[in-house]
Swiss-Prot record:
Family under the similarity heading: Belongs to the UPF0260 family.
Superkingdom field: Bacteria
Identification of the protein by name: UPF0260 protein Sfri_1740
PANTHER family for this protein: UPF0260 PROTEIN YCGN (PTHR37421:SF1)
Length: 148
């Protein structure tokens, strides 16, 4: 079994490999979001980045994603506090606010199947952003789901 480094190592002290392994690969950060102009409320949509694979929930061009999507966000220990749009289920966000990893997290289960079974990932729930005319028509609530 893997050493549970996330319990003993502060986020800012993690190696790049440790940091990257915290990502559960749910794909929620790849969803387009809308901010209401009047209320500043954030809404998730099921319109995903055109690079997201709807089945694996992974980026088709991850190593070179900034070439294809310059506005893609790189989540780092330095900017995690500012990324308030990350869902509550996100391991980076959970650890930043002092929560542990949920029982379905791949670092605890050894694979992504428990995450998919818990309904946490975007698997099978998205549409390619290139096929969407109005993001407002794609607002969904399920990305906010956080299951222990």
């Amino acid at each position: 079994m893997m050493t549970q480094f996330w319990i003993t190592t502060p986020l800012e002290k993690m190696t790049p490999e440790q940091w990257e392994s915290l990502c559960d690969g749910c794909g929620k950060c790849c969803l387009n979001k809308i901010i209401d102009d009047e209320t500043d409320e954030l809404y998730y949509t099921n319109a995903a980045c055109h690079l997201l694979d709807n089945d694996t929930c992974g980026c088709r061009r991850y190593p070179n994603r900034f070439t294809y999507v310059p506005e893609c966000t790189s989540i780092t220990p330095e900017n995690i506090a500012e990324l308030t749009w990350l869902p509550d289920s996100c391991a980076y966000r959970r650890l930043h606010v002092g929560k542990g990893l949920p029982s379905w997290h791949p670092l605890l289960t050894g694979n992504k199947e428990a995450m998919h079974a818990a309904g946490i990932s975007v698997q099978g729930k998205t549409v390619n952003e290139m096929k969407v005319k109005y993001l407002e028509d794609c607002i969904v609530l399920w990305p906010m789901l956080d299951v222990e």
